From Swiss-Prot:
Primary enzyme class: ligase
Keyword Zinc: yes
Cofactor binding note from Swiss-Prot or TrEMBL: Binds 1 zinc ion per subunit.
Name of the protein: Cysteine--tRNA ligase
Species lineage: Archaea, Thermoproteota, Thermoprotei, Thermoproteales, Thermoproteaceae
Length: 474
């Protein structure tokens, strides 16, 4: 498999430091507000990436953090709790972390290897800062804040392809009080009255954002690890500063081999923002559409390119999901009608879609092409395999079904394919009754059963004397 590496600006062969073990870190949310569809795009992509690595035989250790203390959280607590914010601020991240797990469950995102929180790792962060100060890469400001000195790190700007001189020119003419350079960033922020704080050798306060991710990722994955990911908006300054910190601490050029970034999501051509009032939350979308439809909608755009979000796209994805389920449901039933041996090369044609599907994912995770191959296989199953299933053996038909499900599992769709046994047995009995009525030419009664089943979300499709059915998933 080949993947684009932001650090080198090239599509590279994916290899890992430890054979068959892929260790990765994706920057998680700052839990101060509802998750939006931009968040969903990032985490669905890395879920598909993780699923594909597992299909290739890797054990995947994916770590996703929660930045559960931040200025935004403090401000939200003040808005909600007023003078009690100092006591109740933890309620804010707890609420939105719970929402994160609800939304990712509804998006069929597999659980991460670990979910570290900043507040549970402050002691480790203080130790890191002490080491950086001792090595001369960080300095203590008069108010007790600690800053990382960017000028001490060679090749700063390597990830974002920016030169330090140009960055300084684009920054403020005068650095903030306590800073030696406008580009220097906080490793430790001194306490402000009314805000949460932790003890440190320098002053009461809390850690800085860029430090947090380096400490938590390497704590769980070691250094160097295989891939580090997030949204494209994190390339600078966040990921650039992570690299600088790790270079100073470990003395290595890069503490992650591949840097993988997901493109922006836009609404009516503009990036989502509160100021524009165009934020679309995951809760809003998932109240109207299935998680699988949203996964397909995301996958229809290449992860590195901007994605325009529309409800028309979601409806298209919903229709596609319905077709995928129809192919699965009906081929599952058609196994009983398969022949004893293969008389036509129907299966070989079906399995060509699988080759193209995996070829697309091997080529920098080209999910738009992979989606089209899965959808193409579904249509081929419906248009050809079901009509001529008696021309292939049961083993061959089962091989087609298994390969189809395997492909769907990589994209995280067909997750609702299991139907309660009682419901399936009841539907099967009604379908058999309808088949007898058709043989007896009692078409009015047969149509009545079809109609009633449709009202219950069961669609019947006749293939000559055979009838297969599909369920409408809620």
């Amino acid at each position: 498999m080949r993947i684009y590496n932001t650090a080198t600006r090239q599509v590279e062969e994916f290899t890992t430091y430890v054979p068959r073990l892929a260790r990765g870190y994706v920057c998680g949310i700052t839990p101060y507000d509802h998750m939006h569809v931009g968040h969903g795009r990032v985490y669905v992509f890395f879920d598909i990436f993780r699923r594909y690595l597992e299909r290739l035989g890797y054990e995947v250790r994916l770590v996703i953090n929660f930045t559960d203390i931040d200025d935004k959280i403090v401000n939200k607590a003040r808005e909600e709790f007023g003078h009690e914010a100092y006591k109740r601020w933890r309620e804010v991240p707890e609420r939105y972390i719970a929402e994160y797990f609800e939304m990712t469950r509804r998006l069929y995102i597999k659980p991460a290897y670990a979910y570290p929180k900043v507040t549970e790792n402050v002691e480790d962060m203080v130790k890191w800062i002490s080491t950086l100060v001792e090595k001369g890469y960080a300095y203590v400001a008069p108010d007790g804040s600690v800053y990382f000195e960017v000028a001490k790190v060679p090749n700063y700007g390597v990830l974002s392809r920016q030169k330090i001189e140009e960055l300084i020119a684009g920054a403020r003419v005068e650095p903030e009080p306590g800073k030696r350079n406008p580009l220097d960033f906080a490793l430790w922020k001194s306490w402000t009255p009314g805000e949460p704080w932790w003890n440190s050798p320098w002053c009461p306060g809390r850690p800085g954002w860029h430090l947090e991710c380096v400490v938590m990722s390497t704590k769980h994955l070691g250094a160097p690890f295989d891939f580090h990911g997030g949204g494209a908006d994190l390339i600078f300054p966040h990921h650039e500063n992570e690299i600088a910190i790790a270079r100073a601490y470990f003395g290595v050029d890069n503490f992650a081999r591949y840097w993988i970034h997901v493109g922006y999501l836009t609404v009516r051509g503009e990036k989502m923002s509160k100021s524009l009032g165009n934020i679309i939350t995951l809760r809003e979308v998932l109240s109207k559409h299935s998680g699988e439809a949203l996964r397909l909608a995301y996958a229809m755009s290449h992860y590195r390119k901007p994605m325009e979000f529309t409800y028309e796209l979601l409806q298209q994805a919903e229709d596609m999901a319905k077709t995928l389920y129809t192919a699965y449901d009906e081929l599952s039933q058609a196994l009983r009608d398969a022949g004893e041996k293969d008389q036509e090369p129907i299966a070989q044609e079906a399995l060509k879609y699988a080759g193209a599907f995996y070829g697309a994912l091997d080529d920098d995770m080209s999910t738009p092409e992979a989606v089209q191959q899965l959808y193409g296989m579904a249509r081929y199953i419906i248009s050809t395999v079901l009509h001529r299933v008696e021309k292939i053996s049961r083993e061959t038909a089962l091989a087609v079904l298994n390969k189809y499900v395997e492909m769907a599992d990589v994209l995280g769709v067909l997750e609702r394919r299991q139907i309660p046994k009682e419901l399936e047995e009841a539907v099967k009995a009604l379908v058999e009754t309808r088949a007898r009525l058709r043989q007896e030419r009692q078409y009015q009664l047969a149509d009545y059963i079809r109609q009633r089943l449709a009202e219950l979300g069961v669609e019947l499709h006749d293939f000559g004397p055979r009838t297969y059915y599909t369920y409408r998933r809620a």
